[in-house]
C-alpha cells in the first residue's frame, strides 16, 4: 500500500498570474491537503472519504482521481488494477489548489506503486494536463508547488516546467476560506481578453522586482511588490467583503494580501506571529460566510507531496 499526501497551494500570489505559486502548511501541524491511497487489487475501485467527499461528482468517471488512474495506465500502456482511496480534505473551488491536491496525490501514488517508471518532469507534465481538465487550461502554478514544495516560478522552456524561488522564513500566510465556491473557469472568463500597455508594464515590473527581491533577500521590498493588475481588479466582485477585508488586514499589520488562486480564499502575509494571529482572528469573525469556512496560519511547505506510508 502507498499513501501520498499533497499540500494546499496558493497560486498567483498577486504578482505572478499563472506563473507563481506556493505550497503551504499550517503552523499548528494540521494537514491541509488531500491524501490518496493505492493498493494492489484484482479490479479497479475508487473510494471517497473526507470532509468534502460529498462535494465530489457522483459519476465515478468524472472524478479526477479516476481520470488520473486512466491516464497513468495509458502512459504506461497497460491496465494497472488497484484500489484507490481519496481523502478529500480540501474544499472544491476554494482557491487553494484543491484539484491540484487530488491530481498530484493520485499520480504520485500511482507512480510510487509502480516503482517510479516516470521521472518528476514527466509526472509534473501529466499533473498539469489532468488539472487543466478541471480549470479549463493547462497552467502549473498549483500542481508544481503542490508536487515539488516551496515557492515555484513557472518556466516552461528548455524542458524545465518550473524552478524554485527562495522564500522568507519569517513570512506567515494567513489563509481565510469563506466557505463559498468560485469556479476557476468562471473566474477566468471574467478577465479581459486584452490589457492596457501601462498595466502590462506594471505587471512586468512587479514580477521582475519580486523575483529580484526574493533572491537578494529583501522581504520588505518583495511584499511591497505583491500587487495584481491582471486579475484582482476584475475578480474582486466575485468575493463578498474582499475589499473591506484587505483594508482591515493592512491596518492590523499584514505586509501584503490578495486573492489566493482564483478565490474566494484571501491570503494575508504577516512577518510576526502576533500580527498573524490578530489577522486570523479578524478574518475568522468577518470574512467567513458559513460553517464550511476556515482560517489557517501557514508557512511555506518546502517538502511538497510526500509518501506517508509505503
Curated annotation (Swiss-Prot):
Residues holding ATP: 91-101
Keyword Cytoplasm among UniProt keywords: yes
Any one Gene Ontology molecular-function term assigned to this protein's record: ATP binding
Primary localisation category: cytoplasm
Pfam families per the UniProt record, alphabetical: GHMP_kinases_C (PF08544), GHMP_kinases_N (PF00288)
Location(s) in or outside the cell: Cytoplasm
Cellular component terms (Gene Ontology): cytoplasm
Swiss-Prot/TrEMBL keywords: Amino-acid biosynthesis, ATP-binding, Cytoplasm, Kinase, Nucleotide-binding, Threonine biosynthesis, Transferase
Catalysis: reaction(s): L-homoserine + ATP = O-phospho-L-homoserine + ADP + H(+)
Top EC class for this record: transferase
Annotated EC: 2.7.1.39
Entry function: Catalyzes the ATP-dependent phosphorylation of L-homoserine to L-homoserine phosphate.
Cited NCBIfam families: PRK01212.1-4, thrB
UniProt family annotation: Belongs to the GHMP kinase family. Homoserine kinase subfamily.
Full protein name: Homoserine kinase
Organism: Escherichia coli (strain SMS-3-5 / SECEC)
Amino acid at each position: 500500500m502507498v499513501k501520498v499526501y499533497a499540500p494546499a497551494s496558493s497560486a498567483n500570489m498577486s504578482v505572478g498570474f499563472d506563473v507563481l505559486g506556493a505550497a503551504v502548511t499550517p503552523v499548528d501541524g494540521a494537514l491541509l491537503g488531500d491524501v490518496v491511497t493505492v493498493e494492489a487489487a484484482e479490479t479497479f475501485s475508487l473510494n471517497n472519504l473526507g470532509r468534502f467527499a460529498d462535494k465530489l461528482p457522483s459519476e465515478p468517471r468524472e472524478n479526477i482521481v479516476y481520470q488520473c488512474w486512466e491516464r497513468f495506465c495509458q502512459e504506461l500502456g497497460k491496465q494497472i488494477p488497484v484500489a484507490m482511496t481519496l481523502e478529500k480534505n480540501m474544499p472544491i473551488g476554494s482557491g487553494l489548489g484543491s484539484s491540484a491536491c487530488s491530481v498530484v496525490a493520485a499520480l504520485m501514488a500511482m507512480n510510487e506503486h509502480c516503482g517510479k517508471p516516470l521521472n518528476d518532469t514527466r509526472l509534473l507534465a501529466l499533473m498539469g494536463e489532468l488539472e487543466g481538465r478541471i480549470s479549463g487550461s493547462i497552467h502549473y502554478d498549483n500542481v508544481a508547488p503542490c508536487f515539488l514544495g516551496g515557492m515555484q516560478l513557472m518556466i516552461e522552456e528548455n524542458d524545465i516546467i518550473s524552478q524554485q524561488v527562495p522564500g522568507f522564513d519569517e513570512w506567515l500566510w494567513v489563509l481565510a476560506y469563506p466557505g463559498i465556491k468560485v469556479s476557476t473557469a468562471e473566474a477566468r472568463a471574467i478577465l479581459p481578453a486584452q490589457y492596457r500597455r501601462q498595466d502590462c508594464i506594471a505587471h512586468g515590473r512587479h514580477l521582475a522586482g519580486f523575483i529580484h527581491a526574493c533572491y537578494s533577500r529583501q522581504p520588505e521590498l518583495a511584499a511591497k511588490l505583491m500587487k495584481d493588475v491582471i486579475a484582482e481588479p476584475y475578480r474582486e466582485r466575485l468575493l463578498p467583503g474582499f475589499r473591506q477585508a484587505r483594508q482591515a488586514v493592512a491596518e492590523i499589520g499584514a505586509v501584503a494580501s490578495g486573492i489566493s488562486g482564483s478565490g474566494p480564499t484571501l491570503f494575508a502575509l504577516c512577518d510576526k506571529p502576533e500580527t498573524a494571529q490578530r489577522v486570523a482572528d479578524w478574518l475568522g469573525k468577518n470574512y467567513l460566510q458559513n460553517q464550511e469556512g476556515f482560517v489557517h496560519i501557514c508557512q511555506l511547505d518546502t517538502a511538497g507531496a510526500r509518501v506517508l506510508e509505503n
